Amino acid sequence: MGHTHSRQLFVHMLSVMLKHRGITVSKTKLINFLSFIEEVCPWFPREGTVNLETWKKVGEQIRTHYTLHGPEKVPVETLSFWTLIRDCLDFDNDELKRLGNLLKQEEDPLHTPDSVPSYDPPPPPPPSLKMHPSDNDDSLSSTDEAELDEEAAKYHQEDWGFLAQEKGALTSKDELVECFKNLTIALQNAGIQLPSNNNTFPSAPPFPPAYTPTVMAGLDPPPGFPPPSKHMSPLQKALRQAQRLGEVVSDFSLAFPVFENNNQRYYESLPFKQLKELKIACSQYGPTAPFTIAMIESLGTQALPPNDWKQTARACLSGGDYLLWKSEFFEQCARIADVNRQQGIQTSYEMLIGEGPYQATDTQLNFLPGAYAQISNAARQAWKKLPSSSTKTEDLSKVRQGPDEPYQDFVARLLDTIGKIMSDEKAGMVLAKQLAFENANSACQAALRPYRKKGDLSDFIRICADIGPSYMQGIAMAAALQGKSIKEVLFQQQARNKKGLQKSGNSGCFVCGQPGHRAAVCPQKHQTSVNTPNLCPRCKKGKHWARDCRSKTDVQGNPLPPVSGNLGEGPAPGPETMLWGNTAGSKRTIADLCRATRGSAGLDLCATSYTVLTPEMGVQTLATGVFGPLPPGTVGLLLGRSSASLKGILIHPGVIDSDYTGEIKILASAPNKIIVINAGQRIAQLLLVPLVIQGKTINRDRQDKGFGSSDAYWVQNVTEARPELELRINANFFRGVLDTGADISVISDKYWPTTWPKQMAISTLQGIGQTTNPEQSSSLLTWKDKDGHTGQFKPYILPYLPVNLWGRDILSKMGVYLYSPSPTVTDLMLDQGLLPNQGLGKQHQGIILPLDLKPNQDRKGLGCFPLGTSDSPVTHADPIDWKSEEPVWVDQWPLTQEKLSAAQQLVQEQLRLGHIEPSTSAWNSPIFVIKKKSGKWRLLQDLRKVNETMMHMGALQPGLPTPSAIPDKSYIIVIDLKDCFYTIPLAPQDCKRFAFSLPSVNFKEPMQRYQWRVLPQGMTNSPTLCQKFVATAIAPVRQRFPQLYLVHYMDDILLAHTDEHLLYQAFSILKQHLSLNGLVIADEKIQTHFPYNYLGFSLYPRVYNTQLVKLQTDHLKTLNDFQKLLGDINWIRPYLKLPTYTLQPLFDILKGDSDPASPRTLSLEGRTALQSIEEAIRQQQITYCDYQRSWGLYILPTPRAPTGVLYQDKPLRWIYLSATPTKHLLPYYELVAKIIAKGRHEAIQYFGMEPPFICVPYALEQQDWLFQFSDNWSIAFANYPGQITHHYPSDKLLQFASSHAFIFPKIVRRQPIPEATLIFTDGSSNGTAALIINHQTYYAQTSFSSAQVVELFAVHQALLTVPTSFNLFTDSSYVVGALQMIETVPIIGTTSPEVLNLFTLIQQVLHCRQHPCFFGHIRAHSTLPGALVQGNHTADVLTKQVFFQSAIDAARKSHDLHHQNSHSLRLQFKISREAARQIVKSCSTCPQFFVLPQYGVNPRGLRPNHLWQTDVTHIPQFGRLKYVHVSIDTFSNFLMASLHTGESTRHCIQHLLFCFSTSGIPQTLKTDNGPGYTSRSFQRFCLSFQIHHKTGIPYNPQGQGIVERAHQRIKHQLLKQKKGNELYSPSPHNALNHALYVLNFLTLDTEGNSAAQRFWGERSSCKKPLVRWKDPLTNLWYGPDPVLIWGRGHVCVFPQDAEAPRWIPERLVRAAEELPDASDATHDPE
């Protein structure tokens, strides 16, 4: 075959042989295949012949090449070609013979006996699979036929391309089905007779394409095939026979591979026995055990669609493993799809994973044959990447040697179990050696202990061969005779054997094995071995060394490059090294390592050898082959790689010092499962950071004396010398003896400095002797040793003590260990590296050196590394802000013995879990326990007092998320965090505030005190801190996957996405971030399949509903019971169709007494309402939102109140208004506007967008009317971008409200009606109702005491009296507003029975009217002309003149309203002084405000706006407007006041501007010396308005006497009118304005003028009286002079010879002439 013609002949022979079997292959591909064979097997062309043995040898060489170089170096069709050719050469295949015998045994299908049940033929294929027979008349020439063969080779490439991924021949039973057609042809070629019926096994190609011809563009359809067979295949008959035998079909009933029979495909179930064995293998040995992988490889030969692989994995794997498999399966399919796209293969990603348009199983039958092979290959690769199961560690740990079991039998059982679990033989042997010692019985362990790290399994078996029952019996007898334990006898025998071995010199030579001499003098040591060369790898022509090769061409004649250094011999090749470490054991440095990428922060490190880690081994030290020192100025931080953490390898972080020169090692453990670490596997990384040196250092280098940041403690042998240690105590050095028996250290008095204080100790000191009243240090002393350990202690001082004693108070802080020869301690020391009779040491030389760090999980042994740490961040909750640092101590109340025992158990449990810690805190809160229904106790703490001292955080999630917002058709994963509060640590500074005490009965012992380290139950901020902590942990996932729909509420997390692959990828990353923050996912609560239980909902694929609630009605007895029931109903109401009118009977039950314990009974209507609720719960169907389609807000016109629903094919969320309306009267369209606004708000809140359209129950004309006349309607649609419609879909769910009567305003008009009847109405509080109809007056006396109610009565009478159209006017705006809305008000919300009755009667009359009406408002007491004003005035007078029979009644009515004084009443109503006084005295309010007159002189103005006094008074009941600024015109006493929020300058200026707008500008303004009046801004203001401003005497209020009395008058008037006022709403502005009205307009002087009349009225020209007056300064009398003002206690006199008037006290004035009617004169009201 070395010649060209022979190679062409060989290619032609292979082509003909394959074509004869129905397989057309391109000659070009065969030539390329043979070229690759020649490259891999250089000896193959020289053999000259090809037989089955030679071809199998070629296959082995191909597999070896594949293993060494990977799939990239092997063409994709190589294994397929090799398999096809192997089948052609193998005529004696056992499988072929077995199948032939099986076929021969079948009966002739034409003569099937009656006993055999008939078998229905498989169903016909879908239309896309049907083939059309080709035209048999076509004929081709030889040239055309050759071209067609070449094209057919390309066409049939997919038929056998799937074999490219197979590693071996398809010879197992499970692979028989997929290769059925190939084997059939092979049987025929081998001469085996098949049944004669051609329909059963047609001689057709084994894999006809079953897809439509249009799949491959540009190719003609293949030739047709005969009709399908009606008989079963052997596999089908085997399945039917198994079913007839009663085999139970397992969970694999959905696993159906695709078979091809002629030109049809059908879908047939796999043998359930095969799948059942697979499931058992997964549960017993694990999904990645070799036995399980072999079954998966066998299953992979079937043409399984994606759905079958998913179903198989779901049935065999656990929930977590299934998620991992599915995620990896999707990744593998994505890679294959990328390759297919590049090569033009039309097998897409959706086809491979079975999603999208290929989700249904029927559509998966149309795939190309090669697609099934790719799917199976991806599924197998994903299965192989599953992690090893942690439960298999327990299985291995259970394989233990029995007391009487031979050791070799035990090892055989162990090897058999490991072989089924582990595929790596080398790693399995390492594990077997370890378990062969650990799981052996005590006798074998004692014999193997000295050799456990030196010998192998064969040595172990040889050593323990003689250990049996007789051996153990002899050991027991020896122990009994010596009085020792069996273990001590075994140790004694071991030590004796060790000494004997050392003394004897009969051991053989280590080189040649012969006895009598040592290896150093062995004659064979220096003899060199002679090696013979094999085939030259360079020229492949002969057997010689490559360095000696002189050939210039290879065996095929190709030129070869020259050999460099042909005459010289180069150095031997070094060990293989890697960029991230050393796997060959050579010494490497940090400088030899390379970073993975340019941006890599750390240097990767790997293990140098195979290592097996088990949970029982604890932490192990792994060598890296990399040595220090680090680069100058740096220090190394050793961390684990994330990929290693995902595989279950825990890398413990450590610090590599800058001066460390030893080998850098990795501390690794496998806490959960068995882990195999291969040589060269990257598991850790070294991060170099700058070295910062602060403080003092010891002047020595670490070199290679220790690994990590600190050395192990030195172990010192006990000798005759005392174990002394020098300490530095408070800057002084002391040397002392280590005393492990001393509880506390003692310093000799002769070494005690005289300047250090000391005191008498309270307790005695006992030891060998006893010392009473010893001395002790008065203060804590700080000690420090030379290794840097430090601490504080309070030593005793004893006289006559020769040496200082360092007790356990110091030794415990130093971490000193004791070593004793007990068996327990010996076991620990042996694990740390101790050799018997040699002491400790790394090199087993007996030299005392620091031990290698090999800590165990139980923290026993020498040198403890912090096992609890890993390379995860230390996180805790945010610190809490506190109002005070004052400790809060609440005494613990006593507990009964039962509760105390329960509390102690719960506290110990929390202490063991690390949730609490011992405490000495100054805070204390009591604890108590309660027993749950299950019988378990629960620990609670009363933190109410502590909660009062903290700043409360706001709620981060004020509402519950709705599942409706989850995108429709999404894949969902729901997880629950386990004990979320208890996994979140408190801020360290906050722990002390949550301390508690555990009491004891009868104070038998001090209380044990603890404090919480995690979020405690009952703390106000615990929910908020929990939410924020979890939100921070999952924030990176939200940022990395912005399209992921992630819902987090407390400890529940939901993930949803339409891409399942991305969902599982995000879930995997989410678990990592939660784990890094210390949050634990409850594995049993991971939900990956429908239905999901989430936040009280049950989520199904297309809908969800609330979990069914059973309404309990037997306990409904009080108001509190009904309140709780309606609270629960209100929570689920947004997900139920429950209109307000359905629940109204239950709402009515809540009315009445507000006492929570007040009795309530369930009415018949209430029971009906509860039945409606239960029916709504049963029929609920809420769907998910499809954001790609339109959805909207529908307003349903239900009775009493409208109902809203966000709707998309089905309801998304129901919307209801409050059962208690905000106003007493609201029209129906106003309620519709309210629910529209609420619906828009909830759409944005829950779905993040406005509803695309809103459907309202109003036509377009009605909508126009609402936009014109309803403000709330316009506000509801403000800035709405969507569409408004009134067309409802034909859905029964939305049509249920259409039958209800819905009212729109029809009778009440907004505009007056032309030529209608004119009506005026009025009502008075005296119960008189007046009615004027077309100038005819009517009145009636009612029992109502409210004017508005009386007016409603009058309106009702008008509606009953006038049936035709009318226009009604009234002066009550309240009545008019109510009448314009009452027609469409569904619910009258007033609580007054009188008003409710009248409104109901008016509404009923309006609903029955035929003619429209108009209700208008007209202002009362208007001076405008016109008939409307006159008509209203007539109705108003009609309500008064009928009952005002005298002026006294009128005065009494006026006083009841305004509370004037008696003088004003006498002048206003012309009644006697005594009658007026009696009215005031009979008032229930006014007598308490009588004031006595105060006499004094205060300057007054001589005309209006001459002199003002301004001040500020405070009225607290006005709230923020309590600052009342008051100004008074001193001439007329006219008052001006305004309300402000302060009394600064700007408020004073605002008040004066208000006064100027009504009264003008004064000439002079007098104020006090307050800062608001003395500021520069106020002075500039007065100057701008040309006002002369002056102030009084500081701190003397008499200068402001007039305005001060005005303050009192205003306050008294406000108190008078405070009670029983129904004229207006009680606002501060209304009250103050009313008081000013009474004081300015209704308070009259002696002349009958009010302050307003005196201020704005005309000046009187009457003659001024003359008086004589006395000057108080000169005591001289002057006059007579005219009097300008004569007030109460003061007189203003204008001397004739003066320029200005004088103010004189009234007692210094005498009349010069008699005044007219002086006897009837009265003082000014002031």
Curated annotation (Swiss-Prot):
The zinc fingers classed as Integrase-type run over 1446-1487
Span of domain G-patch: 821-866
- List, alphabetically, the GO terms of the cellular component aspect: viral nucleocapsid
* InterPro entries documented for this protein: Aspartic_peptidase_AS, B_retro_matrix, B_retro_matrix_sf, DNA/RNA_pol_sf, dUTPase-like, dUTPase-like_sf, dUTPase_trimeric, G_patch_dom
For the Reverse transcriptase domain, which residue ranges apply? 911-1099
Domain Integrase catalytic, which positions?
A: 1500-1659
Motif segment (PPXY motif): 208-211
State the needed cofactors, names only: Mg(2+)
Whether Aminoacyl-tRNA synthetase counts among this entry's keywords is no
What residues are annotated to bind DNA? 1665-1714
Q: Where is this region: Disordered?
A: 103-148, 550-570
Where, by residue number, does Zn(2+) bind?
1455, 1459, 1483, 1486
Residues binding Mg(2+) 2 are 1322, 1351, 1371, 1436
- Example GO BP: DNA integration
Tell me the keywords, alphabetical order. Answer: Aspartyl protease, DNA integration, DNA recombination, DNA-binding, DNA-directed DNA polymerase, Endonuclease, Hydrolase, Lipoprotein, Magnesium, Metal-binding, Multifunctional enzyme, Myristate, Nuclease, Nucleotidyltransferase, Protease, Repeat, RNA-binding, RNA-directed DNA polymerase, Transferase, Viral genome integration, Viral matrix protein, Viral nucleoprotein, Virion, Virus entry into host cell, Zinc, Zinc-finger
**Motif PTAP/PSAP motif per record, residues:** 202-205, 287-290
User: Which regions are flagged for Pro residues bias?
Assistant: 119-128
- Chain positions of all zinc fingers (CCHC-type): 507-524
Q: Which residues does this entry assign to the site Cleavage? A: 99-100, 256-257, 477-478, 713-714, 831-832, 865-866, 1446-1447
> GO MF annotations for this entry?
aspartic-type endopeptidase activity; DNA binding; DNA-directed DNA polymerase activity; dUTP diphosphatase activity; RNA stem-loop binding; RNA-directed DNA polymerase activity; RNA-DNA hybrid ribonuclease activity; structural constituent of virion
Q: Which cysteines are joined by disulfide bonds?
A: none
SUPFAM superfamilies, per database record: Acid proteases, DNA-binding domain of retroviral integrase, DNA/RNA polymerases, dUTPase-like, N-terminal Zn binding domain of HIV integrase, Retroviral matrix proteins, Retrovirus capsid dimerization domain-like, Retrovirus capsid protein, N-terminal core domain
Domain Peptidase A2, chain residue ranges per copy: 734-810
| Reaction(s) catalysed by this chain's protein | DNA(n) + a 2'-deoxyribonucleoside 5'-triphosphate = DNA(n+1) + diphosphate; Endonucleolytic cleavage to 5'-phosphomonoester; dUTP + H2O = dUMP + diphosphate + H(+)
Domain comment text? Gag polyprotein: Late-budding domains (L domains) are short sequence motifs essential for viral particle release. They can occur individually or in close proximity within structural proteins. They interacts with sorting cellular proteins of the multivesicular body (MVB) pathway. Most of these proteins are class E vacuolar protein sorting factors belonging to ESCRT-I, ESCRT-II or ESCRT-III complexes. Gag-p12 contains two L domains: a PTAP/PSAP motif which interacts with the UEV domain of TSG101, and a PPXY motif which binds to the WW domains of the ubiquitin ligase NEDD4.
**Protein's name according to its UniProt entry:** Gag-Pro-Pol polyprotein
